[in-house]
Amino acid sequence: MLNRISSSSPTSYVSSGSSSAGINPSINVRPPRGGPVDTLVGAASDNNLVYIGDEHGKLFIPKLITESAAKLKNAGVDHLAVEFVKHSDGAAFREALSDGKSAVKHFLEASWGRHGDAWLDKVSEALCSAHRAGIYVSGIDRKMAIDQPKTPMQKILYMKKRLALNVAWDAAATREASAVCANKSIVWGGAGHFSNSKTDGPKDMRPGLVISFDLTGRGSSRINDADEHSHIVIAGEDN
């Protein structure tokens, strides 16, 4: 169980006084308590909008979503918006969801298979687990007319174009949440999209609590006082 992953290290209980200074009042930051599942569910309980910064290829994060799905639903989460699906492919994705994990994995493979079969399998399982728990799962990404980058300069330009998608992501997530009258939403996408988010949440997106990860296996879940890229760090070990 993921709640046990970092149990060998005591959870850090950090005063949120200095960390909370200047933070948008709609973002509620509390010291993590318990293991990774409890920390994620607690963040969702305290906030109407949570951003999960993914590290593509790392298995811990989709495994955490899978284990947390039922508890997230019980905490009031109605909507999971994900980078892994184009918003325009919503109908086809929902059909794949209804057909189960293998269909979802096949649906995602062309765009995300480069991050490894094991990771793709865990992401597919996480999306299906959320769906089975009664959480509405939607895609928020947009097609880009650009080839995969090869040179360092191409990679820089590619990332700039990717980060410019935050406006489109937010519009899609807002639209889908409104369609199902969601009270609480989680947006799950690449951590780079949620950088410099300490004050108001991610750039060009609605204010919300941002979660990042420490997957060294040596840390503990904590309020992020080290940088401006998230509010809470969930500790675990990728395996």
Swiss-Prot record:
Impact reported for residue 169 to A: Not translocated into the host plant cell and loses the ability to trigger host cell death
Keywords: Secreted, Virulence
Record bears the keyword Phosphoprotein: no
Annotated GO CC locations: extracellular region; host cell
Database matches in InterPro entries: HopBA1
Annotated consequence of substituting residue 83 to A: Not translocated into the host plant cell and loses the ability to trigger host cell death
Domain of life: Bacteria
Record region (Disordered): 1-31
Compartment(s): Secreted; Host cell
Biased composition range(s): Low complexity: 1-20
Effect recorded for residue 158 to A/F: Translocated into the host plant cell but loses the ability to trigger host cell death
Reported function: Virulence factor recognized by the A.thaliana disease resistance protein RBA1, which triggers plant cell death. HopBA1 enhances RBA1 self-association, which is necessary for ectopic autoactivation of host cell death.
The protein's name: Type III effector protein HopBA1
Gene: hopBA1
